[in-house]
């Protein structure tokens, strides 16, 4: 019998919500004095540029140029994907399309060394499938995803059930991705509205950045202005927000995300500022070829003493 873990986000630590499973990618020890930065490069038409070398890049931390120690193109190295799907009542009409597109995404993007997990969120965070390399398990879990029905307005003195977008991103980063090595991406499929999260936007961004995870938002907002919530969460991590609708279907967006994940550059450097002070360090990556755009996280937090 399939067991589904459903937990309330409010008042629970990540260690309470999530337990490590045997299928989870094993943690590894890393040299904390080497900072690894993932980025993608696009031309003025949005086409991905995949033929650049180490000497084409320049990286700065807090304005100071850093010496690039390691450089690779991350086409085949292991990837971990956390997919978070909004299952609040407002998504009922698009949930079937989401299931099909996400299933094809897992079929296409996952390779034997990759892992993914699936979570649903509304006023609670539900772990539908923990870390697995099996797209079949993920598709089976997708088939069980269902929207939480709207049960009417709350009684006087009670609060309206919320869509805890920021809490979901925060808890997933802290509870599932923090101990996972290598490349990581968080895909959030939602109408983008956050209503009732305990964590603020800055808290969610900090948690995600601390795990070196890129966030991609897929927004299907039809009536509200919720897409800006996803955009504000994704861009500081080096990711993007896509609007699903007449111009692009959810499946087309997943295809773009897949291409970006397989077209990343990895740049490693030893910071000139070696202080373990826990402070935020701003990052800037440039390429020497005019007209190219680099997508990269805006910074990272130095280790603490």
Enumerate the predicted regions with their spans.
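Scaffold/interface architecture of coatomer-like assemblies
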Residues: 18-305
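Bacterial N-terminal signal peptides
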Residues: 2-16
């Amino acid at each position: 019998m399939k067991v589904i873990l459903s937990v309330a986000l409010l008042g629970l630590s990540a260690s309470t919500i999530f337990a490590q499973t045997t299928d989870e990618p094993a943690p590894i020890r890393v040299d904390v004095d080497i900072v690894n930065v993932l980025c993608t490069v696009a031309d003025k038409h949005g086409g991905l540029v995949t033929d650049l070398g180490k000497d084409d890049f320049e990286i700065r931390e807090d304005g100071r140029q850093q010496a690039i120690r390691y450089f690779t193109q991350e086409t085949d190295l292991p990837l971990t994907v956390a997919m978070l799907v909004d299952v609040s009542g407002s998504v009922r009409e698009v949930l079937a399309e989401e299931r099909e597109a996400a299933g094809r995404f897992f079929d296409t993007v996952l390779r034997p060394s990759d892992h993914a997990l699936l979570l649903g969120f509304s006023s609670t965070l539900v772990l539908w499938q923990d870390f697995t390399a099996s797209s079949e398990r993920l598709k089976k879990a997708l088939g069980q995803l269902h929207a939480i029905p709207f049960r009417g307005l709350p009684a006087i003195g009670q609060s309206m059930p919320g869509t805890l977008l920021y809490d979901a991103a925060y808890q997933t980063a802290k509870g599932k991705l923090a101990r996972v090595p290598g490349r990581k991406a968080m895909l959030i499929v939602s109408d983008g509205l956050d209503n009732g999260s305990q964590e603020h936007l800055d808290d969610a961004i900090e948690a995600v950045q601390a795990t070196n995870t890129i966030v991609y938002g897929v927004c299907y907002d039809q009536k509200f202005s919720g897409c800006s919530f996803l955009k504000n969460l994704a861009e500081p991590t080096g990711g993007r927000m896509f609007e699903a609708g007449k111009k692009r279907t959810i499946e087309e967006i997943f295809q773009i995300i897949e291409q970006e994940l397989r077209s990343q550059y990895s740049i490693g450097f030893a910071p000139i500022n070696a202080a373990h002070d826990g402070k935020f360090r701003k990052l800037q990556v440039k390429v020497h070829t005019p007209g190219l755009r680099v997508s990269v996280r805006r910074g990272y937090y130095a280790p603490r003493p």
